[in-house]
Swiss-Prot record:
It catalyses: a D-aminoacyl-tRNA + H2O = a tRNA + a D-alpha-amino acid + H(+); glycyl-tRNA(Ala) + H2O = tRNA(Ala) + glycine + H(+). Disulfide bonds: none annotated. One of its GO terms (molecular function) is D-aminoacyl-tRNA deacylase activity. Its EC number is 3.1.1.96. It comes from Halorubrum lacusprofundi (strain ATCC 49239 / DSM 5036 / JCM 8891 / ACAM 34). Its cofactor is Zn(2+). Keywords: Hydrolase, Metal-binding, Zinc. Monomer. SUPFAM superfamilies: AF0625-like. The keyword Zinc applies. Residues 22-37 have a biased composition (Basic and acidic residues). Pfam families: tRNA_deacylase (PF04414). This is D-aminoacyl-tRNA deacylase.
Length: 493
């Protein structure tokens, strides 16, 4: 069950709450066990959600989760006892966003990296709901009225002591937007789209990403640095397979103080995001050193994008055996049965280079289609160096890659043949030397002959075939027997 928190002290929150009740098939109930001001009295239930109203602003509520899960003494429904004391999966605070940011729909998690002027405790971070934040941002983007931007914000304000994960879903940024019915309804729709969502990131198959990776950390990243509206971390949320937990913007890090002296707060950012990796915006060597001393890893946005949904143990193995992602490692479409079931070898350098010259995009597709991973150069744009194949009987391998690269060459050559030890490509092409011997002047006439047109020189017609020569190009490859004999890579220590 997802707990929706509406504040009567926030007109935008009430407005969103009205649309939530209008959009859903809610059952009205009564909880006499707690004051109306604290979420008691009338509350609402529908499949997957419970909605309660509180008098205080959200940021000053200590732990509203305690109010949810059905009310003791609720006699409005015979089935009420079935969900009494049900713990919410997470809290969704529907709220206004205030600022000079115009039409904006946002989501963020809460906490204070330093002082607590707007609720919660100082130096304390709440339990984040990165998976829910990712899903609600996706839903906000789908439902946002024309003209509204969508993104995430950094971690800020209270509450900090919620007993379950939480997030804010906000409508901003001033009175015209808070009273905008279309925008409030968009936020309500986005919140209802959270039905069935876990606080942590889950796959399309409903598995948490830590279950897939056999790792205690889901695909969550902690963010440090940058501005309040966190454009880099919004990109990660919206454009990658990863979710973002706590984000300490530059202003929050300024309030935090020296990283090494505040290791406990930095560790909270990881523990309460269920994350083990961080992306740091800008040069912050002291912060990076502290993060690594705490046993976590600093990665780049490129790393997050490149890894995508690949199994993390496989990524670790490939970064050890080939290269790191920041050094140029990129991934193909093949996923082996286990991290140890890979075979690392050199790419067919000359063949690959020529195929890239014929059609760079097709050559890249050929490598990606057959490989588990491969090294690159030129900022990851050009495959080069080593390649890892799956070591099994059914996955594509070196010979399949050679065949696909040879297929790319067919677009630029008359014939292409794969032999034992080489790919042989033949072409009949314009020969400037032969043309010069026939008296053809350099310039436009050369270009016409090279394009397949005849030219006339001193009254003589010279056809392209008259000044063409057959060329044979040999691109070395490993023979099939060499390919079959290549041993699998030994497991890393």
């Amino acid at each position: 069950m997802i707990a929706i928190v509406v504040s009567r002290a926030d007109s935008a929150s009430e407005h969103i709450g009205e649309h939530l009740l209008d959009l859903g098939d809610w059952e009205r109930r009564d909880d006499p066990s707690r004051p109306d001001a604290d979420g008691g009295g009338t509350y609402y239930r529908t499949d997957g959600f419970e909605l309660r109203e509180f008098d205080d602003l959200h940021i000053y509520l200590d732990d509203p989760a305690a109010a949810f899960g059905g009310g003791a003494g609720d006699e409005t429904n015979d089935a009420a006892s079935d969900d009494t004391d049900e713990t919410p999966e997470f809290l969704a605070f529907v709220s206004r966003h205030s600022g000079e940011t115009g039409e904006l729909l946002t989501a963020h998690v809460t906490g204070n990296f330093g002082p607590a002027p707007y609720g919660g405790e100082p130096d304390t971070l709440a339990r984040a709901a990165p998976g829910a934040e990712k899903r609600v941002v996706e839903a906000l983007a789908a439902h946002a009225p024309e003209g509204y931007d969508v993104g995430i914000e950094c971690t800020h304000h209270g509450p900090t002591d919620t007993s379950v994960p939480s997030l804010f879903v906000e409508l901003g940024s001033d009175e015209p937007q808070w009273t905008d019915a279309d925008a409030a309804r968009a936020v309500a729709r986005a919140v209802l789209d959270l039905r069935g969502t876990d606080a942590d990131l889950v796959t399309d198959a409903g598995e948490t990403t830590d279950e897939i990776d056999d790792d205690p950390h889901p695909r969550h990243v902690v963010g440090f640095g940058g501005g309040h509206y966190a454009p880099r971390f919004t990109r990660i949320v919206r454009e990658t397979e990863w979710a973002v937990g706590h984000v300490g913007a530059d202003w929050a890090l300024g309030e935090l103080g020296a990283p090494d002296a505040n290791r406990d707060v930095i560790e909270q950012a990881f523990a309460r995001s269920k994350a083990n990796v961080a992306v740091i915006e800008g040069e912050k060597p002291d912060l990076e050193a502290t993060v690594e001393a705490l046993g976590h890893r600093v990665v780049s946005e490129t790393w997050v994008r490149a890894v995508g949904d690949r199994p993390l143990p496989l990524v670790e193995r490939l970064e050890s055996d080939l290269a790191t992602i920041d050094e140029g490692l990129r991934f193909g479409e093949v996923v082996p049965a286990s991290p140890d079931a890979i075979r690392v070898r050199g790419l067919p350098e000359d063949l690959l280079s020529r195929a890239q010259g014929v059609d760079a995009d097709a050559a890249r597709v050929a490598v990606e289609t057959n490989a588990v991973a491969f090294d690159t150069e030129q900022a990851g744009t050009r495959a080069a160096g080593s390649v890892a194949f799956a070591d099994d009987e059914v996955s594509p391998g070196y010979d399949d890659l050679v065949a696909d690269l040879a297929g790319v060459l067919e677009r630029g050559y008359d014939t292409v043949d794969i032999t034992d030890g080489a790919v042989i490509a033949r072409e009949t092409a314009f020969d400037p030397e032969l043309a010069a011997k026939r008296g053809v002047p350099e310039g436009p006439a050369f270009g016409r002959l090279a394009s397949g047109e005849s030219v006339e020189v001193d009254g003589e017609t010279i056809a392209p075939a008259d000044v063409s020569r057959e060329r044979t190009n040999r691109f070395p490859i490993d023979s099939p027997t060499d390919s079959a004999a290549e041993p699998p890579t030994e497991p890393s220590e």
